[in-house]
Structures are given as structure tokens and as C-alpha cells.
């Protein structure tokens, strides 16, 4: 798509979170606590995508993300792309990926799991990154996709 045809305005410096599934867009926005951010934010949903049919996009001026924030995005929408923008140009493109191990980000759904009864961090292994299937290191309960509850 040419720049003059863009539905969502370009930003000078910042980050573009692209290829968000439309059903996950507002969950990603909530997760990143965008309502508390005092930066210029542009959100577009159900935009045309050649590869996915439709997509969501979030553009945030003058913002970078910590690795933990990226891990959280990957748990909700594992195939999101991040574009780093400087002076209106994309200087870096990055695919967000689910990490091999997730510590302190996800709640175990097993009420008998020690992490729900003792003051300790949860720890999960990713057993299928594409389906985002996790297994608790302590009780071995498996959970996937929309059943993942972030802390």
C-alpha cells in the first residue's frame, strides 16, 4: 500500500505493532496499558491485510518496550510484527515470538498448584509455540490459547 493510501497516519519515531488479529487488538491495548500512556497512539482495526485478510495495528510515538512486555504480547498474539520507526522510516522489523520459558507472567489454572497457595512465581514451559500451549513446571497442568490468564 502506498503511503498516500494509508488509513492510519505515519509516525515520526516510535513503534508499530502490526498484524494483530482483529479479535486480539483491544486485549493487546489493555495489556500494554495504553490508556495510561501519555504518548500519541493510533489504533486501527479490521484493516485490509494481503496475508491475513484483516488485521489490527497500534502505532505509538516515542515508545520502546521491555522484553517482558513483548513476551506478554506474544502470549496473546504470537505472530505480531514490531516495526521500529525513526524519522518516518522503518529501521528495524521484528517478529514477536513466544519464549521457551515464561516466569511470573501467567496464572496456573490448577487451584491445587503450589503457585496458587504459596508466595512464589509461576513458571511455564512452552510445549507448542504455534498453538501457544504451556505446561506448568510445578503441577504439569497444560493450558493453551484463550485459556491463558496473565497475571
Curated annotation (Swiss-Prot):
Its cofactor is Zn(2+). GO terms for cellular component: aspartate carbamoyltransferase complex. GO terms for molecular function: metal ion binding. It comes from the Bacteria. The lineage of its organism: Bacteria, Pseudomonadati, Bacteroidota, Bacteroidia, Bacteroidales. Binds 1 zinc ion per subunit. This is Aspartate carbamoyltransferase regulatory chain. Involved in allosteric regulation of aspartate carbamoyltransferase. Keywords: Metal-binding, Pyrimidine biosynthesis, Zinc. SUPFAM superfamilies: Aspartate carbamoyltransferase, Regulatory-chain, C-terminal domain, Aspartate carbamoyltransferase, Regulatory-chain, N-terminal domain. It comes from Porphyromonas gingivalis (strain ATCC BAA-308 / W83). Pfam families: PyrI (PF01948), PyrI_C (PF02748). Zn(2+) binds at residues 108, 113, 136, 139. GO terms for biological process: 'de novo' pyrimidine nucleobase biosynthetic process; pyrimidine nucleotide biosynthetic process. Contains catalytic and regulatory chains.
